[in-house]
Amino acid sequence: MAEAGTGFLEQLKSCIVWSWTYLWTVWFFIVLFLVYILRVPLKINDNLSTVSMFLNTLTPKFYVALTGTSSLISGLILIFEWWYFRKYGTSFIEQVSVSHLRPLLGGVDNNSSNNSNSSNGDSDSNRQSVSECKVWRNPLNLFRGAEYNRYTWVTGREPLTYYDMNLSAQDHQTFFTCDSDHLRPADAIMQKAWRERNPQARISAAHEALEINEIRSRVEVPLIASSTIWEIKLLPKCATAYILLAEEEATTIAEAEKLFKQALKAGDGCYRRSQQLQHHGSQYEAQHRRDTNVLVYIKRRLAMCARRLGRTREAVKMMRDLMKEFPLLSMFNIHENLLEALLELQAYADVQAVLAKYDDISLPKSATICYTAALLKARAVSDKFSPEAASRRGLSTAEMNAVEAIHRAVEFNPHVPKYLLEMKSLILPPEHILKRGDSEAIAYAFFHLAHWKRVEGALNLLHCTWEGTFRMIPYPLEKGHLFYPYPICTETADRELLPSFHEVSVYPKKELPFFILFTAGLCSFTAMLALLTHQFPELMGVFAKAMIDMFCSAELRDWNCKSIFMRVEDELEIPSAPQSQHFQT
């Protein structure tokens, strides 16, 4: 009984759904019936005669004006559609029709099981897309005072965008502050300094924090029962204040290194004290986490200073020690600094060892990892590689491995080859990058172009093979080959990260859809005809008549030729043959 009741309810439900689906036809016939019944009270016949009289009295100028107005409106719609496509990469009309009109017209599948399966199947790719569109801190970022500001002084251009600097301010607040900073006056001042937008205000706050720490406290130490001496003890220095001054006030790398060494002394003392107290409560644990971030940042920047000043082996040692001491702090991506320094030393065996550790499927990829792996593979065959010889005898196993590594790197970031091959000019890299985007390509090529030039034939091999990647992934936004589909958000994020004077590289190249080009041509042609007809009505009439006569005469000529050939064939009894043979005869 229960099953019978359930079946009856399902049938009733399906009947109701069917009736609502075709209810609009019923309404249509009802409206027609009402119009027929009310034709006399509504005076429909009189109204129709009035409308026909009005249409008969219209002059050709009205139709010309109507055509011109419609062309103007179509042109405005076209301009808006083109602007929307350039900004967002999709058609506004297509997006509205797919997103809003299609559900109303029943284009969405109502099967919940299919929707759930598809959503579960796409969840991994969606998460990967979100992670790839995340903005990362550039591990090879330059110094603001010693490098970025000097570029501004020379060229008058700002190499950093407000969005990029705002992200850096957020990073500084995350790494260098904690909830207990208000207990120490210097840290409280620095907590406000990291939020300042004005560089001079930040520098003044850092000096103020250091001046507060110059206050001396006297500690009474009894030596003899009858006498005491006074020992002068300095309060611990503020390491974050030295960091800010080294980053923004120092005008040379040498000055920045001196300030970072002072910051290292202060930061190392704070780190040791907080390490002993970290288990006494959550507050001390937060302080220790902050002091750890400060110490790692200082040591990494000191290693980068040594690398800039030519002491590359010292920089490599500092980076290796830092990675051994803090192996879990992967957010700074110190291994990318190490790879660049090892390539400068031409220690390719050590580079391969680092890649074997970090070029893992479970770790996030980067342009540095992918292109460095491609450089090592290309180094083995690039000096003897020749496109002509390869086309004759085919690629060897080593050459095939090198080409596959290049294709893998190009698929991950297709913008890099244009900078390595110097097809696009380089600019100073931003402080933040978007993986697989133009910003990451600039950051990589800025430091690694010299390493590719040093390997003989590497750029030649890259030039001959990098475009072959795009044949394997004809639709990169929908499906990738070795990586996930290329994220759509890279262009928008790169425009926020890179300065306005740089032309952002876009992949894949967006081409205007055919219907936009067709609409543009049709609107332009119609508007031109309307304008010419309005200005020169007699001349356009003669032109139109001449075009019609020419078209009709061409049709008649073809018909006459065909009829003549058919009569000749009938009289001579010639078998049917292609028309070209008749003309030859």
Swiss-Prot record:
InterPro entries: ST7 (IPR007311). Its main location: membrane. Belongs to the ST7 family. One of its GO terms (cellular component) is membrane. The modification Phosphoserine is found at residue 386. Glycans are attached at residue 47. The keyword Protein biosynthesis does not apply. Pfam families: ST7. The gene is ST7. The keyword Iron-sulfur does not apply. This is Suppressor of tumorigenicity 7 protein. Keywords: Glycoprotein, Membrane, Phosphoprotein, Transmembrane, Transmembrane helix. It is a multi-pass membrane protein. The chain crosses the membrane at residues 15-35, 62-82, 512-532.
